[in-house]
């Protein structure tokens, strides 16, 4: 491969050839993986940026109700989920190098809007409704960061042989997911740079929201530059539209997508809302612990950190125990710990609530890995069944169903992200009652008293999530693990091992 080709397209790419892989393929793939992870990490960081912005709006002089704050975090989640669909097809259309450069460059838009528009004097002079719609438009652009996941995963999958794709995609996904924790850890510290320490300890203090946008701009430029300078495009990286149509028409794709709504949807949904939920559920605890309240955003970043680190663990356990059993136990555990979180809210115990949610993040992260591990196994079994029934040649079945599995992974990734939006919508609906009561209170002290008296506003939403996890556990058992009375596995489910 010539030096010139490093900045253009690679025509010959044979990762399944051991000699090619060891002599040049491994080095090229590793380089592309490194810069793909970097760009995806920045994408996730900006996708969840408004999770920290919303809890600091009041300190910036912009008052939004709790239900309005939920919209400001939910819309980036929704936009990012929609963008995952076209982003999946962008790599074959534009090439991995060019599209990674473009998608990274688009991240400059939400950064600029946050740095220039949100803290501007013009916005401060507007009426409440105008402020809300302007903020909603600015927040929506953060959704660009959510689409990066699908194109990044699609691009990297072409570079690695089948035997190494699992680890490569796991590292790519986990590296991107860590961007959530990075944002929720660093941005609260950055927005109070220059604010006196004594002032920061007060419930209301000065913040510099512009810094939340400015801090990412150099990294956006660096990600785009590195993608253009060091990444490659493969001429053979073509999308198989037939495989996508076949995958969309297969019921197994939709079943696994529902399961992924429960795992990844929980991870990203709780990542978006946990700082906001903590702030509005445990005001007394945060008032007594200003360091946690201000510097660490209520420790919300820890959930994203744990969930990101747990994803490879879920894949590793699935390799040994099977994807379906691991997924089943993850859902059962998430349901149990949701019940514990409800107990924490009702008893006004932040440690119980927080510990329960850290366990939920752990299990959701593991479930992300185990659910993705199920998809190739399911479609491989479907291919063997078709071949065994004489409907297709075994060799052709292996190739065709492997492509359908790849398509199903992309579809599940897009659909699963919508789960995060659903979680935020449910929590927003649960908050409407307390929002109305707070709005009716006449003085700031009365508003605070009402909010504290109704700090258990999230309990109805948590009961819905509790029920959903057990429904998803039942689906996992019914479709992939159930046996008949004689102890034989039912013929209709596919064992996802």
What kind of feature is each model-predicted range?
Residues 146, 166-192, 409-423:
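Glycine-rich segments within core transmembrane alpha-helices of 12-TM secondary carriers
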Residues 216-237, 473-480:
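C-terminal membrane-cytosol helix-exit motif in multi-pass small-molecule transporters
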Residues 321-371:
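C-terminal transmembrane helical hairpin of 12-TM major facilitator-type secondary transporters
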Residues 71-89, 301-314:
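Central cavity-lining transmembrane alpha-helices of secondary-active solute carriers
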Residues 172-228:
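Helix-loop-helix hairpin linking two adjacent transmembrane segments in secondary transporters
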Residues 105-128, 332-348:
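C-terminal ends and interior cores of transmembrane alpha-helices
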Residues 50-55, 250-308, 368, 372, ...:
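Extracytoplasmic gate region of multi-pass secondary transporters
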Residues 25-53, 253-269, 358, 362:
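Pair of pore-lining "gating" transmembrane helices in MFS-fold secondary transporters
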């Amino acid at each position: 491969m010539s030096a010139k080709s490093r900045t253009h397209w690679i025509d010959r790419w044979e990762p399944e050839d051991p000699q090619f892989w060891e002599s040049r393929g491994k080095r090229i793939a590793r380089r592309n993986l490194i810069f793909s992870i970097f760009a995806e990490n920045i994408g996730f960081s900006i996708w969840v940026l408004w999770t920290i912005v919303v809890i600091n709006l009041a300190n910036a002089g912009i008052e939004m109700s709790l239900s309005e704050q939920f919209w400001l975090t939910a819309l980036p989640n929704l936009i990012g989920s929609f963008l995952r669909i076209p982003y999946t097809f962008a790599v074959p259309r534009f090439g991995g190098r060019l599209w990674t450069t473009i998608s990274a460059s688009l991240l400059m838009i939400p950064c600029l809007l946050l740095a220039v528009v949100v803290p501007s004097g013009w916005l401060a002079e507007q009426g409440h409704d105008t402020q809300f719609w302007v903020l909603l438009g600015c927040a929506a652009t953060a959704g660009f960061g959510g689409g990066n996941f699908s194109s990044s995963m699609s691009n990297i999958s072409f570079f690695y042989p089948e035997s190494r794709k699992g680890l490569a995609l796991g590292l790519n996904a986990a590296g991107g997911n860590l961007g959530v924790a990075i944002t929720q850890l660093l941005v609260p510290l950055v927005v109070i740079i220059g604010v006196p320490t004594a002032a920061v300890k007060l419930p209301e203090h000065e913040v510099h929201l512009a810094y939340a946008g400015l801090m990412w701009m150099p990294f956006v430029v660096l990600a785009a530059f590195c993608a253009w300078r060091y990444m490659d495009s493969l001429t053979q990286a073509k999308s198989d539209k037939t495989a996508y149509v076949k995958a969309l028409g297969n019921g197994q794709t939709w079943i696994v997508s529902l399961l992924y709504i429960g795992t990844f949807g929980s991870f990203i949904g709780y990542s978006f809302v946990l700082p906001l939920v903590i702030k509005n559920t445990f005001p007394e605890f945060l008032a007594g612990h200003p360091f946690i309240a201000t510097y660490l955003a209520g420790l919300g970043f820890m959930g994203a950190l744990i969930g990101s680190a747990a994803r490879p663990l879920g894949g590793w356990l699935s390799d040994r125990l099977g994807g379906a059993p691991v997924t089943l136990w993850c859902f059962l555990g998430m349901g149990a710990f949701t019940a514990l979180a409800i107990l924490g809210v009702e008893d006004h115990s932040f440690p119980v609530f927080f510990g329960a949610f850290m366990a939920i993040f752990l299990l959701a992260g593991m479930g992300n890995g185990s659910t993705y591990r199920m998809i190739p196994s399911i479609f491989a079994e479907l291919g063997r069944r078709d071949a065994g029934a004489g409907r297709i040649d075994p060799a052709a079945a292996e190739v065709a169903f492997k492509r359908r599995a790849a398509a199903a992974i992309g579809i599940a990734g897009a659909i699963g992200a919508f789960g995060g939006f659903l979680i935020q919508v449910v929590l927003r609906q649960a908050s409407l009652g307390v929002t109305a009561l707070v709005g009716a209170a006449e003085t700031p002290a009365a508003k605070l008293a009402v909010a504290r008296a109704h700090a258990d506003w999230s309990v109805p939403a948590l009961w819905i999530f509790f029920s959903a996890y057990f429904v998803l556990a039942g689906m996992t058992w019914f479709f992939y693990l159930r046996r008949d009375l004689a102890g034989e596995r039912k013929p209709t489910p596919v064992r996802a091992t």
